[in-house]
C-alpha cells in the first residue's frame, strides 16, 4: 500500500487547494501540518497523522519545540522532518525580527505578539521581557530583564528605565509569560505595569503595551484599555 499523500485527496478536502483558494489563515493547525508532512504512511492518511501528532504532543507549539529524540520517536517523523520544521520555525522568528526592526511595531500588533510569543513561550519559569523602541516605534532590541519562579517574577521599574535610557528608547513594550498556560493577567501584573508606566513618564518614555503570554494565547493590556 502506498503512502497516503495530499495528492490522493479529493480537491474539496486537500489542504493545499484550500490554502491556494482561501489563504493560509483559513487552515487549521492540522491542515497546515499535513501540508508540511506531505504524506502519511501505509494505513494512515496524512491528515490523520497530523491530527494524531497534535493530539499526542498537545499543541503545535509543543510539536515544534519538542526535543529531537522525542520528535523522531513518533512514527511518521524523522531527522528530515525535524530539520525542516526547525528551519521553518527559525525562518519565522527571523522574519518577525527583521520586520519589526524596520516597521512600526504598533501598526501590526499581531506580528509583535507572535514575535514575543516565540521569545517567551518556551520558558518554564516566568520571564519578564522588554522591547525597546525608537521614536518611530521600530524595535531597537529586546532584553529579558527578570526571571522568576513558575508562578511569579520580581520586576524593578528602575532597571527598566535604566535600560531604556541606555538604548535611547522613546517607547517600550512589556511582556512576560505565564508558564501555567493561562494568559489572564493577575492583580500583581496590573500593579507592576502601573509602576513601570509611572516610572517611565518621568522621562517621557511611553509604555505602549504589556503582553501576557500563555500557551497559545496572549492578552494585551492596550487592547483591554488598561494603559
Curated annotation (Swiss-Prot):
Keywords: Hydrolase, Metal-binding, Metalloprotease, Protease, Zinc. GO terms for biological process: proteolysis. Gene3D superfamilies: Cytidine Deaminase, domain 2 (3.40.140.10). Residues 105-227 form the MPN domain. It comes from the Bacteria. SUPFAM superfamilies: RuvA domain 2-like (SSF47781). InterPro entries: MPN, RadC_JAB, RuvA_2-like, UPF0758, UPF0758_CS, UPF0758_N, UPF0758_YicR. A motif (JAMM motif) lies at residues 176-189. Signal peptide: none annotated. One of its GO terms (molecular function) is metal ion binding. Zn(2+) binds at residues 176, 178, 189. PROSITE patterns: MPN, UPF0758. It holds the Pfam family UPF0758_N. Belongs to the UPF0758 family. YicR subfamily. This is UPF0758 protein Spro_4842.
Amino acid at each position: 500500500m502506498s503512502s497516503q499523500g495530499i495528492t490522493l485527496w479529493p480537491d474539496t478536502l486537500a489542504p493545499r487547494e484550500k490554502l491556494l483558494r482561501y489563504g493560509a489563515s483559513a487552515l487549521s493547525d492540522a491542515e497546515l501540518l499535513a501540508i508540511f508532512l506531505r504524506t502519511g504512511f501505509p494505513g494512515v492518511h496524512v491528515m490523520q497523522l497530523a491530527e494524531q501528532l497534535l493530539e499526542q504532543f498537545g499543541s503545535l507549539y509543543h510539536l515544534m519545540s519538542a526535543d529531537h529524540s522525542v520528535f523522531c520517536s513518533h512514527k511518521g517523523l524523522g531527522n528530515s522532518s525535524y530539520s525542516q520544521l526547525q528551519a521553518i520555525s527559525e525562518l519565522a522568528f527571523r522574519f518577525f525580527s527583521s520586520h519589526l526592526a524596520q516597521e512600526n511595531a504598533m501598526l501590526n500588533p499581531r506580528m509583535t505578539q507572535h514575535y514575543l510569543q516565540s521569545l517567551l513561550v518556551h520558558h518554564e519559569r516566568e520571564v519578564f521581557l522588554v522591547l525597546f523602541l525608537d521614536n518611530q516605534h521600530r524595535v531597537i532590541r529586546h532584553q529579558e530583564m527578570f526571571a522568576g519562579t513558575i508562578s511569579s517574577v520580581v520586576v524593578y521599574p528602575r532597571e527598566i528605565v535604566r535600560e531604556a535610557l541606555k538604548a535611547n528608547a522613546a517607547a517600550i513594550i512589556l511582556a512576560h509569560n505565564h508558564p501555567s498556560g493561562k494568559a489572564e493577567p493577575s492583580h500583581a501584573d496590573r500593579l507592576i505595569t502601573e509602576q513601570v508606566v509611572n516610572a517611565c513618564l518621568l522621562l517621557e518614555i511611553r509604555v505602549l503595551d504589556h503582553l501576557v503570554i500563555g500557551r497559545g494565547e496572549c492578552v494585551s493590556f492596550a487592547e483591554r484599555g488598561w494603559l
